[in-house]
Amino acid sequence: MFPKINTIDPYISLRLFEVKPKYVGYSSVDARNQSFAIHDIKNYEKFSNAGLFYTSPTEITCYCCGMKFCNWLYEKHPLQVHGFWSRNCGFMRATLGIIGLKKMIDSYNDYYNNEVFVKHKNRVYTHKKLEDMGFSKPFMQFILANAFIPPYRKYIHKIILNDRYFTFKFAAHLLSFHKVNLDNQTTYCMTCGIEPIKKDENFCNACKTLNYKHYKTLNFSVKL
């Protein structure tokens, strides 16, 4: 289960709580249960207890902070995922408290760093795919070692514009958008992938005008 990029509130960390729920009609567990039940969804209690209600077959939403999640149907830990991506959600803080929420986020970090990372790292075809794209082995090793670990995960999520799934497709997109060659320490334009740029830049001069709307939101570079 992963958040939809356009529903991540960049300013939510500046607020202590979402004072008023965005979807008041789903404030009760019964209302959230009903949203799943009428669509014949099984084992939905874990989602409604996590403050989430059914929106569509590909999407569920938090009634309080309004964050939407996709690829959710087989998620085993919806409460942890919700807390991880929306840690200032009023529902999450009221349910777990600040200390409890921090402990849960730490444990979920461990889960991703161990189970999820190891599972994807063992996929040999991914190494081959990245190698076919023309990237050096040192850079592939760097990406495969850090793609699922903060702080690099937040960079990856900002880059992805089309694919929402948290798999090695993220690493592949990261490589294609922001090509960094560790052999000569050269960084290339995120748009054309051809023109070399400064370490603190993302686009070459020719592509900056094409990316004006996104330039500020994508104003970051992977720290090696």
Curated annotation (Swiss-Prot):
Annotated protein name in UniProt: Inhibitor of apoptosis protein
Chain residues that bind Zn(2+): C62, C65, H82, C89
Gene Ontology annotations for the cellular component aspect, listed alphabetically: host cell cytoplasm; virion component
Zinc finger (C4-type): 189-207
Assembly information from the UniProt record: Interacts with subunit p17 of host CASP3.
Pfam families associated with the record: ASFV_p27 (PF06556), BIR (PF00653)
Induction: Expressed in the late phase of the viral replicative cycle.
Family the entry assigns: Belongs to the asfivirus IAP family.
Source organism of this protein record: African swine fever virus (isolate Tick/South Africa/Pretoriuskop Pr4/1996)
Cellular localisation: Host cytoplasm; Virion
Domain of life: Viruses
Start-end of each BIR repeat: 29-92
